[in-house]
Amino acid sequence: QKLIDSGLRFHHVVAPQVWAWRSGRAKKYAKIFDKLYAFFDFELPYFTKYGLETVAVGHPIADGLIGKYKSQQSEKIITLIPGSRMSEVKRLMPLMRDIVDRLVRNGYRDYRFVIPTVETTESYIRNVVHDWAVTPTLVPSSERYDIYAKTYIAIAASGTVSAELAMLHVPTVVVYKMN
């Protein structure tokens, strides 16, 4: 409050998602910030109605993905995305194994299962999947968008990836396992 009262101007990058919950919070932000930078055009009215100067600057993921990767579903690929943090990978891999087992038992044996991995989880995932009914192919994270474009369906951790898959029009089951 002292900084605000001192006359400093405050610019906030990435608008709080008041459109998702508690839209009335926008009024509070209008009292704090002098200017707000939002990802999407539809966010502007939530803040401008309270007099907060708000500018849509685009979304770094959406702007780079939408229209760039065309669906190429000639292969039968089911992509498993257990996340990028080791804690979530350890929590979700048993669930992913159960899902793969069920899919294989129910006629999806001829599908290729793929898991994009980051460097910090690749070794762990490789050790976990070696004895699955069908061993998934591991690919580096740098190739994930090419894989997503070929994906029939994805089973993904909740997070940024679910937004990426939606932008690429990949049918996705989002999974989350609580402690």
Please name every model-derived segment.
Residues 1-70, 80-92, 102, 118-120:
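Active-site and donor-binding regions of nucleotide-sugar-utilizing enzymes
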Residues 10, 54, 111, 136, ...:
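Hydrophobic anchor at the start of a short beta-strand
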Residues 13, 39, 57, 116, ...:
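Generic beta-sheet signal
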Residues 45-51, 126-131, 164:
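Short loop/helix-cap segments at secondary-structure boundaries that form the rim of catalytic
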Residues 73-79, 111-112:
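Charged active-site motifs of nucleotide-sugar-dependent glycosyltransferases
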Residues 88-150:
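Donor-nucleotide binding loops and adjacent catalytic segments primarily
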Residues 141-179:
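A donor-sugar binding/catalytic signature common to diverse glycosyltransferases
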